[in-house]
Design a protein with these regions (language model features):
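Glycine-rich phosphate-binding loop at the start of an alpha helix
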Residues: 22, 44, 67, 100, ...
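CoA-thioester-processing core
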Residues: 44-54, 60, 66-120, 133, ...
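A short, well-ordered alpha-helical element
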Residues: 1-7
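C-terminal long alpha-helix characteristic of the crotonase
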Residues: 80-85, 136-184
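Glycine- (often His-adjacent) and acidic-residue-rich active-site loop
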Residues: 5, 13-53, 93-96, 175-178
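Short, structured loop/turn "capping" segments at alpha-beta junctions
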Residues: 112-116, 125-132, 160-165
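Terminal peptide-recognition signature
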Residues: 11, 24, 73, 106, ...
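Short, active-site-adjacent cap segments at secondary-structure transitions
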Residues: 16-20, 66, 88, 171
Length: 184
């Protein structure tokens, strides 16, 4: 946010196996839902509890994106996924809940019924299904993932940074305003 030379960011995992597998949910469940982990006030990866980011963020999802990892991806503005990406909020399978924004963001992005279908079952969703559901913007082969994310970033960089920031701000601030006139 503070770097004036940076207009857009890309968040990705190391390697091709996982974007982020999230917390060790079985260990956390065995600990009664409590773990001695230090999560910044800005949330997982410094993103899930930040609601006023002015610069666009692109999640380049390579492989597994589960639990907190999926919540990180959902906190980004765009998701580009490799064909081997898998998404889920599996917390209910071990007696936990996705408390880093996943339960709030997913229904807003794909609708309540589709989101509940994922959240109440903890089922895994492929990149293709994620695109069909509406939370993935593009699906590419794993070796093309970073280049595809950079392509989205280049398209954003071709626009005015002030216009991009204003567009993002207005879109997020008015997302839940049902009255069109009030949202204007």
């Amino acid at each position: 946010e503070k770097d004036e030379n940076l207009w857009v960011g890309i968040v990705t995992g190391a390697g091709d196996r996982a974007f982020s597998a999230g917390n060790d949910l079985k260990f956390q469940a065995q600990a009664g839902g409590k773990m001695d982990i230090n999560i910044a006030s800005s949330g997982f990866a410094g993103l899930t509890s930040r609601f006023n980011m002015t610069k666009p963020l692109i999640a380049a999802v390579n492989g597994v994106s589960m639990g907190g990892g999926f919540e990180i991806a959902l906190a980004c503005d765009l998701i580009v996924a490799s064909t081997n990406a898998k998404f889920a909020l599996p917390e209910p399978k071990v007696g936990l809940a996705a408390l880093a924004g996943g339960m709030q963001r997913l229904p807003r992005q794909i609708g309540m019924k589709k989101a509940l279908g994922m959240m109440l079952t903890g089922r895994h969703v492929s990149a293709e299904e994620g695109m069909h559901l509406g939370f993935v913007n593009e699906v590419v082969e794993p070796e093309k993932l970073i280049e595809a994310a950079k392509n989205w970033a280049r398209q954003i960089e071709e626009c005015s940074p002030m216009s991009i920031r204003a567009t993002k701000q207005v879109a997020y601030e008015n997302f839940n305003e049902p009255d069109l006139e009030k949202s204007m």
